[in-house]
Amino acid sequence: MGDQRLQDWLRSPGMDSKPWYCNKRPSKCFAKCKHRRLRFPPMDTQNWVFVKEGMDDFRYGCPSPEDTLVCRRDEFLLPKISLRGPQADPKSGQKKLLKKAALFSKLSPAQLARKAFVEQVEAQLMAKHPLAMYPNLGEDMPPDLLLQVLKHLDPERELEDAWACCETQEKTTEVPTEPGKHPCGEFCLKPPETPVSHLLPEPPETGVSHLSPEPPKTPVSSLRPEPPETGVSHLRPEPPETGVSHIRPGPPITRRRSSLLRQLLKLDSERKLEDARAPCEGREKTTDEPTEPGKYPCGKFCPRPFETPLSHLRQEPPKTPVSSLRPEPPETGESHLRLEHSKTRRGSSLRSEPSETGVSRLRLAPPKTRRGSSLHAEPSKTGVSHLSPEPPKTEVSHLHPVPPKTGVCHLRLEPPDTSQVSNLLLYILKVLDSGRTLKDVWDRCEARVKKTKEPTEPHKSPCGEPCLQPPETQVSHPHPEHPKTRRRSSLHSQPPKTRRTSSLRSEPPKTRRTSSLRSEPPKTRRTSSLGPEPPKTRRVSSLRPELPKSRRVSSLHPEPPKAPESHQFSEPPKIRASYIKELLQEDTPSTKECVSDSLQYRYTSEKLREFFKWAGDLGADEESIRNLFDFTPKYRATHEDQKFKKVKECSSELKYSMELDEKDEDKFFSQEKYWGRKFHTPSNSYTAQRVKMKYGAWYLKPKLWKKLRSDEPLIDPKLLLKKPDEPDVLDDLYGPIAFKDFILSKGYEMPGIIQRLFARRGWTYDSVKTPIQRAMIFYKYKEIVEASEED
């Protein structure tokens, strides 16, 4: 019964799959017959080919078929799959060797002899003492450290020479040394009796560390260094950091010693030599790091100072209260003075920079303290030397030097020179304010110009400017010996590009005969910037004053000139309105109307400016051309803030050439209130809803599945087969039957649509023919009716 039910259940509709116990069938890949070919040839182990390693690498092309190892079933034992039971391995039938049987070596006699020789040599080497491999150990290792190693590794004193050398050196090092000579108590290098090439001198007796000389006790410091007559070419005094002079030998070589110690300490597996490990590790670190010249990684070599004459020495600083000298070989024929910052409390320091030309330069560095000065002179290869004067003992941050005829520098404080600015303002007013509307400004400028035009002595103002005379304070007047050439020294200057230019804090001039003078702004409260006076030369210098950082000095903003201002403004300068407002900010209150009125006359279009430029190149004057014609600009220069204009406020010229009618214009401007609105697009009311679908029951065949909604019931496939066919249009027509008769009369093949029609209706070709009987009766009756109607 049970088997019958199982079979019925398996044969039920939709259950065509086989039971579970029928799924595990033997593989079809393996052949049952011996000579039968497999369905999958790669699975046949008899056809496998074994190749060497790398022959299956096809990344760089096909490998060459040479030296290919091919193993067939006749040459190699391959695993075979058979349907029979497992067979015994043929190797298992061989007799196994007994455990006590002697296994003979597979090495050749030559290999055995070589192996025995190597073992013999190793045994001889290991039989010696471990320290015998280092014959120079006593020379490279310190005696105290070598003694500690020998105590642990050679307690029986087999190395007699090493013990004797170590004990003798230990006795010599235990001798007391004098204080200051050997602070470390180790190897001391005796000073050689021969001259040494490079030495450092002893320190000065003063407390200066960085070559900062003491302040001079006298108000005048006149130094005239001359080239030395000895063989010493370079003198550079540098103070040492300690009280003992240092020789500059190369640093001791401890790398070899440390490597020997590391190899010896490897024998100390119990780490008994902790004292020996520490210096070894320390030396290893110091030898790896780069050391500065003159410094030693361990700091144990302290040589004595040499007392013999030397070839190259570094001169000691003088013990007198005179400024120290620091001569260096200059690149040109003149000496350069270097004035470093002093650490004392008097005055500022002067410093010169080396020049690439034959002109020496002095730079006035910002003083760090109040008083004192330091002078560092350099020797020259010629007999000429320039000296740097000491500033006066007054609290002045900016000095105004006047180069006199004798070459002495005079320093004095003077009020600022405003003649150039007054001339500039007066010329601007002549150009821009020809009607003299700004009367107050005209009066002030003319008054200032009159004051500056007072007669002066010829030796005071060579260029028509106020001369600054030397002060009456105590000022050093060094008189240098000038060479026969025209080279001059410059104070507080930058490197000039010419050889015949003297500049006071000058910028590189664009021409060869002009130099710009520029005063530095003072950092005090009640001092003003000083304008220097140029020397008596044929070159004219230009003044560029800066704004002083003081509270009681008026600020003047002159225009940055594009050409030298010494030509008294031969061309009208191009000045902007904002720049004029800054010039007139302090003297007179400027308003927007004044600026706009002054600029109204100067307004020109771009084409007119190009025309004036072209006429100016030909030699014509712009003002003369303006006087010939009447320029009435349509648009005035305005400085109002820009704002957005509406469409109604636009001028008629900005509108399109195609004008609108009155009705269209009213309609166009009436829509202005709707322009700012945002048009919201209507939201999509339709939202797609997810519908769960199903495709059929799992027990049905996939061919019978149909896409349906999850809530719809399934359709029985049997009912689909029993469903009657829908009536066709061709069933009641006369044409298909007549067409069938035509096909039969001709002997052609019957079309499929006619065959299906006759099969659906159950007709045969002989039973249904044309003419049809009912059709004949119908047409006969119709003819009778038509004939009766005619009668």
Curated annotation (Swiss-Prot):
Amino acid composition bias (Basic and acidic residues), ranges on this chain: 274-288, 333-342, 449-462
Sequence segments annotated as region (Disordered): 195-257, 274-409, 449-573
InterPro entries for the chain: FAM47
Start-end of Polar residues biased regions: 349-358
Domain of life from the UniProt record: Eukaryota
Residues annotated as signal peptide: none
Residue spans crossing the bilayer: none
Protein family per UniProt: Belongs to the FAM47 family.
Name this polypeptide is given: Protein FAM47A
Organism this protein belongs to: Homo sapiens (Human)
Gene expressing this chain: FAM47A
